[in-house]
Amino acid sequence: MDNVGCEASSSRDPKGKKAVGFSPKLRVDKDCARWGNENVEEQTIGTQPTWRNHQHQTSRIRGFICATIIFVVCLGALSYIYRVDVSTTMLSTNQMNESHTAQCKNPPTRREWRGLTTGEKQEFTRSVNCLSRVPSKWGLNGTLYDDFSALHGGIGSWSHRSSSFLPWHRNALYVWEAALREHCGFNGQIPYWDWTMDWMNLANSSIWDSTEGFGGDGEVGGPITVGEGRCVVDGPFTDLRPIKYNHTYVQHCLSRGFRDNGTLGHMSGLPFRPEIIGEVRRKETFVDFEAAVEMHLHNAMHLAISGDFLALTAANDPIFYVHHAQMDHLWWQWQQENRERRLFEYNGKHMHNSTGHDASLDSMLVYGGFTEDIPVSEVMDTEKGKLCYRY
């Protein structure tokens, strides 16, 4: 599957490195500075395109990718700095490791958001807000919640458009859940949002409920904030004040801007209809499955929600975690359908700028000193080892 947008080329190759987040010196292609009107080739599954071939949307996609490449260049340098003293900055997951690594006999089940009780939903949102009051581990002028957004926007960006997209985010979710437990006393499991249940009317999903959900769209008629969005004014996260948007330090309200191309307040559910999900799950190889999940399902939702979700700092929005848990859920289901062959199937391009198909189970997932770097092999089976969960 062809990548859409600009590429960043490396002026030196990482010798012997297979690490997501390795930060070589970059040069940005001069064409990346242009926001052309060329049509993007449609990415299709089934009989209808997942994304509409529209010049306005093309411009937004290209602009989004160009801006984030500049952000990655800056964060690349920081990724080295963050590794200098990991003894004082590394986020601990020891509590979970001690309880789960030695034996994982009864892995708990991650449930769909609507399967949680009212009390469990409130406990989850309380813990998320709590994390936004814990001081930054990286010494940023923000909180631990902001650290996770910076982690994804910098180191995590190297996993996009590559085979490491699914395993890198799987472990990042685990680390985030561990932080909720350690710092905020969270005693549940990360839920997932099964958007296939809402495909006929995504904008009115119960996930956006102001009482038992994540709050809804940005304020109708309110001022534009970031990512063509507006401030979220209902729900449990109205007090969140992220400190960055992509490469820019700008404290702002949590912002969303539901849209279906030029139609505001609406979100197209076509990419998430059941027959599309069925086709994705029938992909025979890991490489094809990963590409379908990321380039279709993942990207389509980021564009539909917009606001904070339009940038690589999308983890500013708590919906990021239940969205990515759903993609992890789909991967888990795909693995279970043929455990003998798929449980440890991992190949393709390990990093988005890899020059060849270098991915292996020994390839490292790197987190820039935020938490321990681990080989891909440690996150392939969620029901054994340190992860210890199922869906």
Swiss-Prot record:
Name the source organism.
Diaporthe leptostromiformis (Lupinosis disease fungus)
Topology in the lipid bilayer: Single-pass membrane protein
Q: What is its EC number?
A: 1.14.18.-
Q: Which residues bind Cu cation B?
A: H298, H324
Q: Which InterPro entries match?
A: Di-copper_centre_dom_sf, Tyrosinase/Hemocyanin, Tyrosinase_Cu-bd
Q: Name one GO cellular component term.
A: membrane
| Membrane-traversing stretches | 61-81
Kindly indicate whether the keyword Cell wall biogenesis/degradation belongs to this entry.
no
Q: Which gene encodes it?
A: phomQ2
Q: Phenotype upon knockout?
A: Abolishes the formation of phomopsin A and related metabolites.
Could you tell me what this protein is called?
Answer: Tyrosinase-like protein phomQ2
Functional description taken from the UniProt entry: Tyrosinase-like protein; part of the gene cluster that mediates the biosynthesis of the phomopsins, a group of hexapeptide mycotoxins which infects lupins and causes lupinosis disease in livestock. Within the pathway, phomQ2 is involved in the generation of the common 13-membered macrocycle, possibly by catalyzing the hydroxylation of Tyr.
